[in-house]
Amino acid sequence: MIASVLPTYTRAPLAFVRGEGSWLWTADGSRYLDLGAGIAVNALGHAAPDLVATLTEQAGKLWHVSNLYRIPEQERLADMLVAKTFADTVFFTNSGTEACELAVKMVRKHFYDKGQPERTEILTFSGAFHGRSSAAIAAAGTEKMVKGFGPLLPGFVHLPWGDLDAVKAAVTETTAAILIEPIQGEGGIRPAPEGFLRALREICDETGTLLVFDEVQCGVARTGKLFAHEWAGVTPDVMMVAKGIGGGFPLGAVLATEDAASGMIAGTHGSTYGGNPLGCAIGAKMIEIVTAPGFLDEVSRKAGFLRQWLEGLVAAHPDIFEEVRGQGLMLGLRLKLPPGDVVKAAYAQNLLTVPAADNVLRLLPALTISEDDMAEAVRRLDAAAASLETQPA
């Protein structure tokens, strides 16, 4: 008999009833140190007091009214994002997948309205993850995600990760956009190669192609910048955002330049819940907090310590760990054994981590994690690795 919850996840036998900061509790009082943060969602930790206060205050005023009317909370958050990024305009969604759907529509409509309807192709990269909708799985093209789901949305060209020559060869008169994660998350915490994003920007400028960044996982202060592409010194035409922007509340967005968004006039897109007052009030508080003086510097400072300690783990357990990857507090440990084995060994140490492709263990702690909690997490990873080393082959 099928479970009442559709079994599309292989869930761990854990259920949590309370969270605070970087810690989660089960009903029996067991306490777990969380290095996953809901897969980079709980950016300020669990039950962050500022977000709880904002949610409580807004919940007592207004939750939902529909985009048929102006929504002051939505306008405030949009103004904040426009002021702090490349963007001229923002559309709010409830998730990263929804943001991907709009980004695809936006770039294609842009060229249709410019009198170039043949420009529909979008170049993407191996190892990508852009969500689970039909368009998003077509964009990524990963076999395990597309198998069995019938005809996919056409118009995506899949290229080897980081292969600039392949990009140059693939851009044609039918190319609309290049879509890339500045740091692949699900793909194994793989930052774009040095200079790659800048080279893509130059190709797009030369060919009139739009550059789309998926910052759903790597954005919103995760790397020590507000958005990860800032490290490369380039800007996109369109950007997808979600996860951390809501701090745990379902919220996403598409940011765009005026030119890139020029085709999206009234009636071309919509969302019943997207941009609701409750979500946008929380999003505005998130942006206020992570852009406050010193916050991003503190993320980078703590990330430096954590990376150094993880490098020590690699040296101490060469049969388990191969290398440290990533930037800021978006880190990964490439493993010499299946990630699931290490995840389970970490469970035994009451430590939560997240597996990824390319044999990688993701470490995505709350941006507010303390040094003591980071040190404790490394101690527990050390114990997990030691337990695996003592297991019979």
UniProtKB/Swiss-Prot annotation:
Its cofactor is pyridoxal 5'-phosphate. It is found in: Cytoplasm. Pathway: Amino-acid biosynthesis; L-arginine biosynthesis; N(2)-acetyl-L-ornithine from L-glutamate: step 4/4. CDD domains: OAT_like (cd00610). The keyword Transferase applies. Its EC number is 2.6.1.11. GO terms for molecular function: identical protein binding; N2-acetyl-L-ornithine:2-oxoglutarate 5-aminotransferase activity; pyridoxal phosphate binding. Binds 1 pyridoxal phosphate per subunit. One of its GO terms (cellular component) is cytoplasm. One of its GO terms (biological process) is L-arginine biosynthetic process. Keywords: Amino-acid biosynthesis, Aminotransferase, Arginine biosynthesis, Cytoplasm, Pyridoxal phosphate, Transferase. N(2)-acetyl-L-ornithine binds at residues 132, 271. Pyridoxal 5'-phosphate binds at residues 96-97, 129, 214-217, 272. The modification N6-(pyridoxal phosphate)lysine is found at residue 243. Homodimer. May also have succinyldiaminopimelate aminotransferase activity, thus carrying out the corresponding step in lysine biosynthesis. This is Acetylornithine aminotransferase.
